[in-house]
Amino acid sequence: MQKSEALFTRAQKTIPGGVNSPVRAFKAVGGTPRFITKADGAYMWDADGKQYIDYIQSWGPMILGHNNAPIREAVIEASCSGLSFGAPTEAEVIMAELVSEMVPSMEMVRMVNSGTEATMSAIRLARGYTSRNKIVKFEGCYHGHADSLLVKAGSGALTLGVPSSPGVPANVAEHTLTVEFNNLDSVKEIFETHGDDIACIIVEPVAGNMNCIPPVEGFLEGLRAICDQYGSVLIFDEVMTGFRVSRGGAQERFNVKPDLTCLGKVIGGGMPVGCFGGRRDIITHIAPTGPVYQAGTLSGNPVAMAAGLAALTQIKQPGLYDSIFENTQALVDGFQDLADKHNISLTTNIAGSMFGIFFTDVEKVTNYKQAINCNTEQFNKFYHGMLEQGVYLAPASYEAGFVSKAHDAEVIEKTLAAADKVFSTL
């Protein structure tokens, strides 16, 4: 670990905290972050040459595994024609058509560069479309680092213990109404008070930033009904779940149609890509066809579009998800069986190729309060034990894990063998 330690010390002199995204700093689990030099399939290697089975998968994008050959070749080919034009390309058109085909609720699509851009723009659009100010989000759900969304947020904000960030003016935060995930009554109550001024509900249909928490039965359907009743826009933040919990995202898996959808991560094949889209009558309020302004110098970047198209073309092929979901289930079942074997209080959640492990005696974790009351000290011991065994999990107990096409039965078996050793020490 000498090289990672030296790089971390060096990085802290010129990069805040030594990292460019807070959760990477290992602040939640302690110790030195591993500096990665390469990745392939289900594996990554650090600067000291140690190999890891990777369950972060770049925080979700790499559903086909690291260093996927068709994506790599598409990026190389596209880059030979130029890196950025600042003008429309056919690749953008093909990408929008493909996204609309795979996620039919997205009748029109606007490309951006990140998930944060997508959610920020979708909320502005919802406000412009409805001429209302307030938005509803859920405790522990993270939708990027836009000011109005950093109120009781999840992900790195939750890990740092500052779910409502300093630097967000009170007169901005007051328009963000926060309610309990998986609790329809709390949503109904807030609408009874503020319904006439609520522009939208934004929700992760599977909460992936307070670990992995699927919706309880009827929750998403209830949000749809409330938005219909009050004329508010329902936004699904599928930056994490899009093309990961099913080919058509969480909205296909749970059969609930939002008005707007935000995508990121998988859609870029590892490159920085996001998009938002939805009902034609709403999307046409975006400039240049409407008055709601949104723009981006690198939006629709040709190299990024090439990577995304190569990823989605493979994802469209029949049978891909069957094996990924089967292996994810085997992993999660294995964790649970081993924890039971060693008398460890553990519960697990799963949604497609996303999973969560919670050190708790609660039978099923369904909300923010249960998630933050899990045994983080025990998770940290498990985390470092697995890291020592060559298994790279998310360095925070509030982050979901991800399985890719490259995580075959052999990889799962190796992971569970490592977990057996680590559980025996807890």
Curated annotation (Swiss-Prot):
It comes from Alteromonas mediterranea (strain DSM 17117 / CIP 110805 / LMG 28347 / Deep ecotype). The lineage of its organism: Bacteria, Pseudomonadati, Pseudomonadota, Gammaproteobacteria, Alteromonadales. Signal peptide: none annotated. NCBIfam families: hemL, PRK00062.1. One of its GO terms (cellular component) is cytoplasm. Keywords: Cytoplasm, Isomerase, Porphyrin biosynthesis, Pyridoxal phosphate. Its EC number is 5.4.3.8. Its cofactor is pyridoxal 5'-phosphate. Pathway: Porphyrin-containing compound metabolism; protoporphyrin-IX biosynthesis; 5-aminolevulinate from L-glutamyl-tRNA(Glu): step 2/2. InterPro entries: 4pyrrol_synth_GluAld_NH2Trfase, Aminotrans_3, Aminotrans_3_PPA_site, PyrdxlP-dep_Trfase, PyrdxlP-dep_Trfase_major, PyrdxlP-dep_Trfase_small. SUPFAM superfamilies: PLP-dependent transferases. The keyword RNA-binding does not apply. It catalyses: (S)-4-amino-5-oxopentanoate = 5-aminolevulinate. It comes from the Bacteria. Its main location: cytoplasm. GO terms for molecular function: glutamate-1-semialdehyde 2,1-aminomutase activity; pyridoxal phosphate binding; transaminase activity. This is Glutamate-1-semialdehyde 2,1-aminomutase. The gene is hemL. It is found in: Cytoplasm. Homodimer. The keyword Cytoplasm applies. Belongs to the class-III pyridoxal-phosphate-dependent aminotransferase family. HemL subfamily. One of its GO terms (biological process) is protoporphyrinogen IX biosynthetic process. The modification N6-(pyridoxal phosphate)lysine is found at K265.
